[in-house]
Amino acid sequence: MNKKHLAAYAIVAVLFAASGAYVGMNKNNPAPPLTAVPPPGVTEPVAALYKQTLPDAKGVATPLAQYKGKAMLVNFWAPWCGPCVQEMPELSALASGEEGKKLQVIGIGIDSPTNIAEFNDKYKITYPVLVAGMSGTELSRQFGNAQGGLPFTVLIGADGQVKKTYLGRLKFDELRKDLATL
């Protein structure tokens, strides 16, 4: 093997090592969740949400129009979504705490009624958990969730306007700051 080949192999090895280090560092530091503040006056998806009547985890029909006039935090989730499950205890605490007096937290499950009911029975969620099945993905897309990623959370003011959307696991410090502006 001559020196030119040896130098080329060494350069390739260094490039592979650098690539591996870069990938390894990004796995430890995942990208932050995406949040968006829609332009003022965005109400069309909220009107579509209020037109929905979805069954809860026990199969009881729940018209979402009953929440009109109240600030809402709508969380699109699924039982198989790890980050969704991780944020649920904090959402439950939020719903049953001081913030819950001013804000209606709602979970919209994107899965079968059976899976949602089993999950709800196991984890004892303190806020309404509704079943949308796969149509929940389309509903979340109306709020700007183009890829249908989960969890996806929408903060809606009492005025019926979308205040902010969050894609990925919620950062509750950021959420509490946003709630203070309602």
Go through each PLM region and give its residues:
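A short beta-strand-turn-helix
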Residues: 46, 51-72, 140-143
